[in-house]
Amino acid sequence: MLWQRLAVVEWAALAWELLGASVLLIAVRWLVRRLENLSRDPNRCGTLSSLPGASAAVSAQPGEVMTMDAMLARLKLLNPDDLRQEVMKAGLKCGPITSTTRFIFEKKLAQALLEQGGLLTSSLPKHSEVTGTAFIHGTSRTPAFVDRKQTQQACLSEDRDFGYSVGLNPPEEEAVTSSVHPIPFSASTRNDNHKAGVTTAKEPLLYYGVCPVYEDGLVRHERIHVYEDKKEALQAVKLIKGSRFKAFPTREDAEKFARGICDYLPSPSKNMSLLSPVKAMPLCSNDGPKADGLCLAESETVNKERANSYKNPRTQDLTAKLRKAVERGEEHTFSDLIWSNPRYLIGSGDNPTIVQEGCRYNVMHVAAKENQASVCQLTLETLENPEFMRLMYPDDNMDMLQKRILYIVDLYLNTPDKVGFDTPLHFACKFGNVDVVNVLSSHPLIVKNPRNKYGKTPEDVICERSKNKSVELRERIREYLMGHYYVPLLRAEDTSPVIGELWSSDQKAEASSADHCRSSPRDPVMTLRAFVGPLSPSKAEDFRKLWKTPPRKKAGLFHSIRKSDPERGIERVGRELAHELGYPWVEYWEFLGCFVDLSSQEGLQRLEEYLIQKELNQKAQHEIGEEEGCLQDRTSDFGSGKKYSNSISVGAFLDGGDDISLEEVKNQQNTVPSQSQPSVDKFQNSKSGSPSLGQKADPGEAAVGFYPDNSRNGFCYPLNSRTADGRETEATNGEEALPPPVSILTQEFDKLNLQSLGDNLFETPNKNRELEDKILASSKGVVESGLASPAAIARLENKQVRTNSEVSEAMAEMSLGPNSPQLGVQAGLEPGFSSATADPTKRLFLSGEEPSKLDRDVLAALECAIIDPGLYPAVHRWKSTVMGYSPSDRQSWPSPALKGKFTTELVDLDCCHSCSGRSSPAGSSPSKPGHTTFSSGLHSPGRYSPAHGRHFQRVACMARLAAL
């Protein structure tokens, strides 16, 4: 038992020793911490009586230079009104002060004050004021601690606002209000366990307006949905599909919102008394900017856009329909989809629609990856069509539509994917798709040197995924990436050619050819006639020098060609050089109305279509000529004698069964003018002047037949002037047969109608199909009345480019032709002489019925072309016909008569359609989208070639202005 008592005593002593050591250790640690605190903050032990001296040692005096951090800390203590005043006093521009913009204005103001030597105005709070306030409220925090806390708040505010200025999610409105109006520092520092005592104000009454869908909001829902309870507003939003709600301080504003009047109204915060003056200013101001120079962007009403009826396509449709059509190159299916719903291409915020999630590919990524150059071209053409963008935004003006077009096209061309940051140009170069590279690199908005995730440009990844591509293809891709340059040939009205400077669609500075721009009204108007390209810059410059100064071996030949053929000699030289070097070449042909290389497959197809159309016109002319004889007989029979002529005129002027005397009939007949021999001037002025009076019929010589059974008025006229034995009746007493007055009036109206049709030739020269139908129908009517000769009608049916003088000659021929009802007999020509004997197998030429220099020029352009009779039968027949003439005869062929000035391509080449069938940006209709075909041949003029240069230079200029 003794040993047990000893053990208890020992354990008790040991416990007391441990307890004493612990207390001593705690005391030592407390003293050490106390000493550390005193050494860190020697001013902590100061009293309230020593406040002025202590604060004077820390606070900055007026005129004292401060650091950037201290300046920012002091500016953080200002309320928005004081901060705005300081910014304005510093000579800086100030806008709305929010949680996002406050740090920007504070930083600008601090920099401005530091540059001015740190001179602070009296409105800025001193450190002494802050310190005094803190000690009055019994806080233990020092000005240095306040500076640290304010600096930390500034850093937190900067971190919180990061990204909002570059388009990321904005902060909540409650956060905006709380940061703009911070709680006073004195109210947040209490010595009751260092807890902030903040008194919240009572929330004002809010009204929640619920706005239904814009189109049918006032139809389906007659009542105006305004609620005072937020739960009721949320319940109404659930019941009304597609609606939205917003809180307002007044009932009137909520009712406006519920009616669909979406003017900008700031959402009320929980404490309306602390709203910033920028937010509380009037919404509209007729006086312009305020006196303090604030920007009133937020006070302006938001542009009301009418919502379109297109819904976002389902993910299944984007994958199974749109993406599959792009991958397979189904242009018609792709075009039908995007025109039926433009949201297949344009997503929310005018961003490209994503067709493959994960990698976030759009249509251009997929098309570039699958080598679908035609889909890439069709996508760009559709997006650049204002009518397509108008489907999404029907109320936008043209300027806004163009800005939207530039924005969406730039995104489609230069948006990287999510995985490797590869643009469509990266994909095209990576897989060696040279046609896609050609389409993309030729656009003026393309960025040719973007870097992907691994820091590589498109040039660095050429054929990275296709190792079996040839070296020539790799070089072509590199040349396309260098730029698309063209060597243009320009001509003035006097046909003097000029080889212009290099042209490119993405030129950044001066115009393409500054040497031929008109600096004076006396300078000739230069128009584009041919060009070579696209080429790399070095090749384009070398070809330009070679074209201007041919090689010594061929200098004599080329010089003789240029001198002997001033109209198209330099084109022949450039064509031969381009074909020899394998460069793309196109020239303008007036009879086709487009730029094309006739030796290419595309040029042969265009020529084949033109010749087939011309053969059809000649065949129709021949059929009209065969029927002209009987039609002329009918007209001449009406005017074969004065007896029947008078009968016709009398019957024409008798309307009903009213009683009329014979003398009145004779007087009316004498007042009808007969057609005299017209002239070209009288015919051209027939719209304003009346026809001249001709010979009057002698009523005394007219023997009017009376047939009471065949005529209501007692007068009749025979329907056929032939006798029983088939012979034609002759003129009475050997006098000339005069046409009936009714026929004369009909002919005058036919002439006026035909002249109006001829005038339309100059208004719409490119609408050949519609105009042909009108002219052909009118021409048949004129031939039936015996007014025009078939040769004159054929000239109007022809699809060639017409001049004013040519149409005037055609009109004169129609009125003075040998088949005219009056002049045909005077000239002694028999009816149907001109075209009744026309040969249906008449030889075919490009201009008119006789060979001309145009046939020789086209033959020279086809010198190196291989013409397949099975594919191009009309071209083969035409070439055989032309080759049937000897070279000396072909040299003597005259040039086509062009007595007037051209009214087509010489005015503006931007309106000409490309020979590849691509329409202009505004060439399609939303109801009938044009299905274009892309030609990847070297001899096809690109969409971004000099033929469309003015349009795409304007596009590039607008893009550069928008980037500024």
Curated annotation (Swiss-Prot):
The residue stretches assigned to a coiled coil in this entry are none
Keywords carried by this UniProt record: ANK repeat, Cell cycle, Cell division, Endoplasmic reticulum, Membrane, Mitosis, Phosphoprotein, Signal-anchor, Transmembrane, Transmembrane helix
Point to the regions of Polar residues compositional bias: 667-693
Q: Name one Pfam family in it.
A: LEM
Q: Which GO terms describe its molecular function?
A: protein kinase inhibitor activity; protein phosphatase 2A binding
Q: Where are the ANK repeats?
A: 420-449
State the family it belongs to: Belongs to the ANKLE2 family.
Protein name from the UniProt record: Ankyrin repeat and LEM domain-containing protein 2
> What is the native source organism of this protein?
Rattus norvegicus
Q: What is the lineage of its organism?
A: Eukaryota, Metazoa, Chordata, Craniata, Vertebrata
Q: Which gene encodes it?
A: Ankle2
